[in-house]
Amino acid sequence: NLLRERNLRTPSLLHNAPTAGNHGAALIMQYLSDGKTLTECMQNAVTSQERHSLLSLATRSIATCHRFGLRQIDVHMDNFLLSDKEVYYLDGGQIQVQGESLEEELAYDNFALFLAQFKVENDEAIGDLLHEYHLENKTCSAPVYADILRRVKRARNLRLINYEKKLLRSTTANRNIRSLDKFAVYDREIHSPLLEDFISDPNRYIVKD
């Protein structure tokens, strides 16, 4: 395990085995009863100070990965679990190793990818987060705010392009319905028989004079 080899905290792997037909694998991980992902913690945070503290935790964790030459391909708050005031790394299968420490260009692009998932109004916190990052990873030169902001904007554009592509097909988040006479996309969280009925025949729901 790339994380354990570098003494980075991660839930213990208790058992793993291939699935039938060897199309995948099943993993049984250590259960941390009080564990919450940083996404869950962020949703429960009441004050801006609490949210900033959680972003700082994630930033330092990402910087630590980079210092050890590790890069999370799809880096986001769900990759980190907070348990007993300690941060655990998750989703080790989506981590690549790039040598003893991550090259500066890759490191800052990866950090920008993380920052790009948040709303634009949160960009005012980037300066403080860059300071937190550099405290944890001094293998890179001190990051320049304008350069990181440029990378964040580029990452946001790429995220938007990828999101638009996903709208053309069904995913775990969205359902896509396409036929000769209709095209509909909706969030699976709002799925219901009533919505299905509306999509199949919307004219029945139009009030006529």
Locations of regions flagged by a protein language model:
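Hydrophobic residue at the +6 position relative to the catalytic HRD Asp in the kinase catalytic loop
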Residues: V75-L82
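Short alpha-helical scaffold element within the canonical Hanks-type protein kinase domain
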Residues: R51-L55
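A short beta-strand motif that forms the metal-chelation/ATP-contact edge
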Residues: A26-Y31, E86-G92
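Intrinsically disordered, low-complexity segments enriched in glycine and mixed charged residues
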Residues: N157, N162-K166
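Conserved ATP-binding subdomain of kinase catalytic cores across diverse folds
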Residues: N1-L38, L57-F68, Q72, R151-R154, ...
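C-lobe/activation-segment region of protein kinase-like
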Residues: Y88-K153, N157
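Short, glycine/acidic-enriched loop or turn micro-motifs at the edges of active sites
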Residues: S33, M77, Q94
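AlphaC helix of the protein kinase catalytic domain
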Residues: T37-T47
